[in-house]
Regions:
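Short strand->helix junction
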Residues: 12-13, 109
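Exposed alpha-helical structural elements
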Residues: 18, 54, 118, 122, ...
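Conserved SGNH/GDSL esterase-like catalytic core that processes O-acyl groups on lipids
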Residues: 4-7, 13-88, 93-95
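Alpha-helical cap/lid subdomain in secreted, periplasmic
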Residues: 56-167, 171-176, 180-184
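Conserved catalytic region of serine esterases and O-acyltransferases that act on ester linkages
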Residues: 160, 171-208
Length: 208
């Protein structure tokens, strides 16, 4: 058993359905413990978190193995340069205080699936530059949506995740934070049937 501490910084894409708690539930099923905290604000960009200062102060207090960064959902598409600047600023603080950076690669909106390529490229580029881990949630979403119609991953607004969408994202954290495969974890998603869980786990495993 291993214990990992992770600070999640983002917005409703992380807060909706409590993604950190879903990751912790999956980790527990593999015999690991995830101690987590979340700093979130609706629609927030990483720059907004930088300007507010709470996130940096929390990192500076120490005790984190990982800091997970989730950018505003369309900024990497519209302005990858600004996104990369935001990540660099956070990564410097994260490294200085002994933690590692994980980038939560998010998904395209339901009406603009073609934008996933730009999202993926933007996250991968800054991940490669900094040696940061990339959690490939958006890639897993893209793979799942290409093969399955149900369960729905997008909520009614076409942007935010359903429980299934958040669960799929959570599965993508296991290989990064714990070097564990999500395949075969049972009873890990109340509200989703076993067949749906198996399909979601398979998409996450394939994306890694």
């Amino acid at each position: 058993m291993s214990a990992v501490s992770a600070l999640f910084i983002g917005n409703s894409f992380t807060q909706r359905n409590d993604v950190p708690a879903l990751v912790a539930r999956l980790a527990a099923a593999r015999g690991h413990a995830l101690h987590h905290a979340l700093i979130s604000a609706g629609g927030a960009s990483l720059r907004m978190h930088l300007n507010k200062g709470e996130a940096q102060r929390t990192i500076e207090r120490g005790g984190w193995d990982w800091v997970v960064l989730q950018e505003q959902s369309t900024l990497p598409i519209k302005n990858a340069k600004r996104f990369h600047e935001n990540v660099r600023a956070f990564d410097a603080v994260i490294r200085e205080h002994g933690a590692r950076t994980a980038l939560y690669l998010t998904w395209a909106r339901r009406t603009a699936p073609e934008s996933q390529r730009a999202l993926t490229d933007a996250y991968r580029a800054i991940g490669a530059e900094l040696g940061a881990a990339v959690v490939p949630a958006g890639i897993a979403w893209q793979r799942f949506l290409a093969e399955h119609d149900t369960p729905a991953l997008h909520d009614a607004d076409g942007s935010h995740p359903t429980l299934a969408g958040s669960y799929l994202a959570a599965c993508c954290f296991l290989p990064v934070l714990f070097r564990e495969n999500p395949l075969g974890i049972e009873r890990s998603a109340p509200g989703l049937d076993d067949d749906a869980v198996a399909r979601l786990q398979a998409a996450a495993a394939a994306a890694g």
